[in-house]
C-alpha cells in the first residue's frame, strides 16, 4: 500500500519532525508512506487577499494530487470517527492520500473530490500537530487490522 500525506505548509524544521519520522518508520512495516508539504507564491499572495482566495490557492495546489487513490480530507466539519472506523479507511486499499488544509480550510468544490471527509476532533490544532495525530492513527489503524498489541 502507498500512503501520501499532503499538507499546505512551508518546508521548515519543526520540533515535531523527530516524532513524525519515528511514526513514519513504524508505519513503513505496513505501507510505503510519503509526507508532501506544498506551498508556493500563489498561497503566500492569497493569504494577503482573503480566506476565499487562500482556499482557492490551496485547491489549485492540491488538484494534481487528487487522482488514482482513495482520498481522505481532514476537515473540522468532517465525520468524527473512532480508531476502528479509521482502520477501515486503510483496509484493502492500494493507495490512500490524506489532505491537511491550510489555515483557511478547503473550498466546497475540493471537498466534493474526497472519498471520505473526516475530523480529528472538535478542537483547533496546527497542521503540524494534526500530522502527528494522523500518523499515530495510521499506525494504530494498521495495528488494528493486523491484530498487533499496540492498539490495546
Curated annotation (Swiss-Prot):
Subcellular location as annotated: Cytoplasm
GO molecular function: rRNA (pseudouridine-N3-)-methyltransferase activity
Binding site for S-adenosyl-L-methionine: 74, 101, 120-125
Record GO cellular component, one term: cytoplasm
Pfam short name (any one): SPOUT_MTase
Annotated catalysed reactions: pseudouridine(1915) in 23S rRNA + S-adenosyl-L-methionine = N(3)-methylpseudouridine(1915) in 23S rRNA + S-adenosyl-L-homocysteine + H(+)
EC number: 2.1.1.177
UniProt keyword annotations, A-Z: Cytoplasm, Methyltransferase, rRNA processing, S-adenosyl-L-methionine, Transferase
Gene3D superfamilies, A to Z: 3.40.1280.10
Domain of life: Bacteria
Subunit organization: Homodimer.
Function: Specifically methylates the pseudouridine at position 1915 (m3Psi1915) in 23S rRNA.
Family (UniProt): Belongs to the RNA methyltransferase RlmH family.
Descriptive protein name: Ribosomal RNA large subunit methyltransferase H
Gene of this entry: rlmH
